[in-house]
């Protein structure tokens, strides 16, 4: 467990360094985000000097790293606000969106996998296979744009911008209405992969000899299904946890398309304007959070599967 924790922290810092290098060598400057396009180069250089952007790459990163190790993530170049303050304002929205989508995706994947096995080789099984593997394989970005076009422009039945309407930030139903499309996009865009994993593990469980013996003993089918579900949930949960980082990145993409007030929209805006403190803080935070969810899923998997409890966390 300790090795995994140390490795996760190392990966988090290494990810921030790679991201910093990419931003450093990309075109553009934060100075132009403050409306100085028409100003002289000397004025732009003065702004970059005030922000410390005139220093060499390694020196800039070293300054950020030492501050981050002390818990100081700095302030936004764009707004001048504390990075921690900006993250705190948006993290709840991202958590609600990501958690809601992940739970719905998990339940739907397991349900459809069981339903497909129950009606194996039937018309229902073929429909599930077709929908999952031929329709729901679009990237989140593409599917989100399609949903904006259909539900926001053509039909105009659901909101496609923001996490709530202005003045209705505390209205539960209004916030729920703004969640529908982002959650659906996340679920449908990931359903093909997660359903395939759930089907494989559940079908493998049904093929186990002890399960076949239960059929031979004429045990009630619902009891057999319960045992199969209990047996197959452990690897399914472990896989979901291992996919936390990629799912989180998908959540960020969906937030940016729907202008959802979460960490994702903040991250993409900061990347565009080269707002280093926010980008590095969010990358670091995202990797650590994904590592935490992976670790948590391993614990749940061991609880679900008693045979794994004897294994050490490595």
Language model feature labels by segment:
Residues 130-192:
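Membrane-water interface segments at transmembrane-helix boundaries in multipass membrane proteins
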Residues 11-59, 155-175:
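Hydrophobic alpha-helical transmembrane segments of membrane transport/permease proteins
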Residues 40-70, 258-270:
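Short hydrophobic, aromatic-rich alpha-helical segments embedded in or entering the lipid bilayer
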Residues 8, 90, 94, 130-133, ...:
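Residue-level signal for discrete positions within transmembrane alpha-helices
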Residues 91-124, 171-314:
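Alpha-helical transmembrane segments of integral membrane proteins
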Residues 54-110:
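An internal, D/E-rich "acidic patch" concept
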Residues 2-12:
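N-terminal signal-anchor/signal peptide hydrophobic helix marking the start
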Residues 1-3, 111-147:
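Cytoplasmic-entry segments and transmembrane alpha-helices of multi-pass inner-membrane transporters
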């Amino acid at each position: 467990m300790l090795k995994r924790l140390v490795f996760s922290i190392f990966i988090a810092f290494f990810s921030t360094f790679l991201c910093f290098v990419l931003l450093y060598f990309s075109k553009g400057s934060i100075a132009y985000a403050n409306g100085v396009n028409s100003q002289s180069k000397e004025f732009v250089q003065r702004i970059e000097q005030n922000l410390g952007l005139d220093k060499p790459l390694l020196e800039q990163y070293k300054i950020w790293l030492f501050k981050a190790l002390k818990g100081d993530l700095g302030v936004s170049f764009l707004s001048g606000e504390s990075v921690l303050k900006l993250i705190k304002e948006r993290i709840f929205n991202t958590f609600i969106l990501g958690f809601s989508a992940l739970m719905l995706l998990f339940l739907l994947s397991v349900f459809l996998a069981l339903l497909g096995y129950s009606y194996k080789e039937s018309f229902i099984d073929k429909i599930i296979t077709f929908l999952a593997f031929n329709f729901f394989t679009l990237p989140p970005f593409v599917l989100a744009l399609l949903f904006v076009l259909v539900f926001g422009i053509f039909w105009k039945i659901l909101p496609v911008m923001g996490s709530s309407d202005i003045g209705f930030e505390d209205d539960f139903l209004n916030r729920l209405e703004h969640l529908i499309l982002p959650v659906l996009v996340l679920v449908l865009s990931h359903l093909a992969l997660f359903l395939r994993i759930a089907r494989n593990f559940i079908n493998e469980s049904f093929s186990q000899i002890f399960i076949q013996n239960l059929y031979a003993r004429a045990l009630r089918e619902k009891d057999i299904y319960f045992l199969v579900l209990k047996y197959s949930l452990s690897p399914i949960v472990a896989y979901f946890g291992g996919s936390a980082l990629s799912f989180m990145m998908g959540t960020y993409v969906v937030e940016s398309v729907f202008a959802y007030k979460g960490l994702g929209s903040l991250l993409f805006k900061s990347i565009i304007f080269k707002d280093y403190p926010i980008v590095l803080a969010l990358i670091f935070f995202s990797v650590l959070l994904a590592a935490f969810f992976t670790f948590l899923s391993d614990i749940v998997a061991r609880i679900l599967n008693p045979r794994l409890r004897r294994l050490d966390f490595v």
